[in-house]
């Protein structure tokens, strides 16, 4: 009995520590009714790209409900989608800092072994960011994925006369890009 209570406490602590930190829950849609616990659902969350000021990503993913979710023993499906949009009049970033692919979102999708992640990739020649969402496991991940691309030229172009830029910065569409120092 003590072992069962200990496992329940441990799983509750892990559930409290997990999740997509730094996200705002936008909403959810119920997909399957469960008599015990929450219903299976699709959740939508928003989070700002930590290195690109003015870009917000929206992610939707399947969330398993029921009694297993209550004790954090469920395993969510690998179905997810991501979309990123401009949410400020101008976008600013340092090209050196975003040059390498980076994980910008991570959320546990099972008790221990499965995670849902969003990776950001940057194409410097086109000034385009690609965001890919996928899930993985310790042993084997899933090939299911979704991606979105965001260009500096998507929004209204900045007026160079009205925007102050530093000598190591350039304006590309709605983006102010800080270039590497030589």
Each language-model region and where it sits:
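Residue-level signal for mature regions of secreted extracellular proteins and peptides
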Residues: 10-11, 50-51, 77, 145, ...
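Sec-dependent signal peptide recognition
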Residues: 2-8
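Mature extracytoplasmic domains of secretory-pathway proteins
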Residues: 56-125
């Amino acid at each position: 009995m003590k072992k069962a209570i200990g496992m329940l406490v441990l799983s509750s602590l892990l559930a409290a520590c997990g999740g997509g930190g730094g996200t705002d829950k936008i909403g959810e849609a119920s997909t399957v009714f469960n008599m015990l616990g929450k219903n299976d659902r699709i959740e939508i969350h928003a989070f700002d790209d930590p290195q690109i000021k003015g870009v917000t990503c929206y992610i939707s993913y399947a969330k398993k409900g029921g009694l297993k979710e209550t004790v954090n023993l469920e395993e969510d499906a690998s179905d997810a989608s991501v979309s990123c949009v401009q949410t400020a009049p101008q976008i600013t970033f340092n090209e050196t800092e975003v040059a390498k692919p980076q994980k910008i979102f991570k959320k546990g999708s099972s008790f221990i072994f499965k995670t849902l992640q969003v990776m950001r990739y940057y194409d410097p020649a086109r000034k385009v960011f690609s965001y890919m969402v996928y899930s993985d496991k310790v042993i084997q991940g899933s090939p299911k994925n979704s991606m979105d691309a965001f260009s500096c030229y998507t929004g209204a172009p900045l007026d160079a006369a009205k925007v102050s830029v530093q000598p190591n910065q350039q304006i590309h569409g709605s983006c102010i890009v800080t270039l590497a120092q030589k």
